[in-house]
Regions:
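Conserved alpha-helix/loop element of class I SAM-dependent methyltransferases that forms part
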Residues: 19-41, 56
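Conserved Class I S-adenosyl-L-methionine
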Residues: 50-52, 169-266
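Class I SAM-dependent methyltransferase Rossmann-like catalytic core
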Residues: 4-21
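A conserved beta-strand element that flanks and buttresses the S-adenosyl-L-methionine
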Residues: 108
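Class I SAM-dependent methyltransferase SAM/SAH-binding core
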Residues: 42-98
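Short catalytic micro-motifs in class I SAM-dependent methyltransferases
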Residues: 111-112
């Protein structure tokens, strides 16, 4: 497979929007509408990507301003081009050092903080930005022990590119649920931490490799130039096809574990 730019491709990411949308909506379903009604407060979508969820947050909580924060200019350009609701705006920012311009009522983040090493130590600071009763809502993939992610390292060590990919590990490790519970409990009036395994239904050629190429596989691809980039991808895709075989009906089932955290500030 010939690969195009290794910049985070918004169109490739959105190709799997349906598979990624359900966890985002499940997380949103635990938010309290009363928080969104706080005068002078803002809902922040941290790691907003192309803005799909930011726009849904605005629909879910009419009257509340929503600000999407992301580090990718390409994603932000996509988000702005597809957003007409004037209550929704976007800004470039570093999630590791997030400082809100306006007081937050809800800090929402879908599949972003797993990219940041040491993210668990950032969460108490996020909680302290909230008023009493405000909510922190976070979802992160916790699939790093599954073949889809373990085989990234196998492929990285299996070719002439091994030296270039040494030390690249993709997403940061997402801890056991109890670790997040223990860190956030002292600051929380209410705290929910749970996991869900989604059976994602994919189709087409190399569907799991295509899926991960816009997320966890991306750092490996970015570290290589052609022709090694395509050769590495093909090696990974071959390994993945054995771990997640295509069924006779053309469907590939891709189990994907995700961690959810919803904390209400004490």
């Amino acid at each position: 497979m010939a690969l195009a730019s290794t910049v985070w491709d918004a169109n490739l990411y959105l190709k799997f929007a349906d598979a990624r949308m359900r966890p985002a909506l499940d997380l949103m379903g635990r938010l309290d509408p009363a928080n969104a009604a706080r005068a002078g407060h803002v809902i922040y979508d941290l790691g907003c990507g192309a803005g799909n969820i930011s726009r849904i947050l605005a629909e879910r909580f009419p009257g509340a301003p929503v600000v999407g924060i992301d580090s990718s200019e390409q994603m932000l350009d996509k988000a702005r081009s597809q957003t007409v609701d004037t209550r929704v705006s976007f800004a470039k920012g570093d999630l590791a050092h997030f400082k809100p311009d306006a007081p937050p009522s809800i800090l929402y983040s879908n599949a972003a903080y797993q990219w940041l090493p040491g993210h668990i130590d950032m969460f108490p600071g996020l909680m302290k930005l909230l008023p009493s009763g405000g909510q922190l809502a976070i979802q992160m993939p916790r699939n790093h022990e599954a073949p889809s992610h373990a085989l990234m390292r196998t492929a990285a060590d299996a070719g002439p590119w091994a030296a270039k990919l040494k030390g690249i590990g993709g997403i940061a490790r997402v801890e056991e649920p109890a670790r997040y519970f223990d860190v956030l409990k002292p600051l929380s009036a209410d705290l929910e931490v749970w996991e869900t395994v989604y059976q994602q239904v994919l189709s087409g050629k190399d569907p799991v490799a295509q899926y991960t190429s816009s997320t966890g596989l991306r750092p490996f691809l970015e570290a290589l130039s052609e022709p090694e980039r395509t050769q590495f991808y093909d090696t990974y895709a071959s390994l993945i096809a054995k771990a997640y075989p295509t069924r006779p009906d053309g469907i590939t089932l891709f189990p994907f574990r995700r961690l959810f955290i919803v904390a209400r500030r004490a």
